[in-house]
Regions:
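Rossmann-fold NAD(P)-binding glycine/threonine-rich loop
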Residues: 10-14, 18-70, 88
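Residue-level signal for pocket-adjacent positions within structured domains
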Residues: 5, 27, 59, 104, ...
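Phosphate- and divalent-cation-binding pockets in alpha/beta enzyme and binding domains
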Residues: 1, 63, 91
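Active-site-lining helix/loop region of Rossmann-like oxidoreductase modules
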Residues: 74-137
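Short amphipathic alpha-helices and their capping/turn segments at secondary-structure boundaries
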Residues: 1-11
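Short, well-ordered alpha-helices that flank and scaffold nucleotide-derived cofactor binding pockets
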Residues: 3, 45, 94
Length: 137
């Protein structure tokens, strides 16, 4: 799926995976169509040693532009993140906070990535952080 992505120089680096799998756009991949693995797990396999964090895939670019620092019911809009490296997730969560949103930890890549991919209640919903947290729990 990510045939053009090179692992050169990415070992030990944090890679933010913003991608979503759309078979009609990306072509069909049996392991993704069967939901055996997430696209983030496939990316992590293709970038051994990279510290993959899935983030920014469930928010539209217009929300990133227009809703920076916006509060809904007294809370910032949540952006779900998933990953297997707690320290990498903390770094990405810090970045999300710096740009005016609140990171919501959805768990590891395998489990969490499924919670904020296309077709879920969290995908492009622009929910307050606590509401998003309840949906990914």
């Amino acid at each position: 799926m990510f045939a053009d992505v090179s692992a050169d120089g990415l070992a030990g680096k944090i890679v933010i995976d913003t991608a979503n799998y759309y078979p009609e756009r990306d072509g069909h991949f049996t392991e993704l169509d069967s939901d055996d693995r997430t696209s983030s797990e496939v990316l992590a396999e293709q970038l051994p040693g990279a510290r993959i964090v899935k983030a920014f895939n469930a928010i539209q670019w217009t929300s990133l532009r227009d809703k920076v620092g916006e509060y809904v019911g007294g809370q910032r809009i949540g952006i779900p993140i998933s990953g297997d490296d707690p320290q990498a997730k903390r770094v990405v969560a810090g970045l999300i906070g710096q740009i005016g949103f609140e990171a919501v930890d959805a768990g590891p890549l395998a489990e969490g990535g499924r919670k904020h991919q296309p077709g879920t209640d969290c995908y492009t919903a622009d929910l307050p952080a606590d509401e998003l947290r309840a949906k990914v729990a």
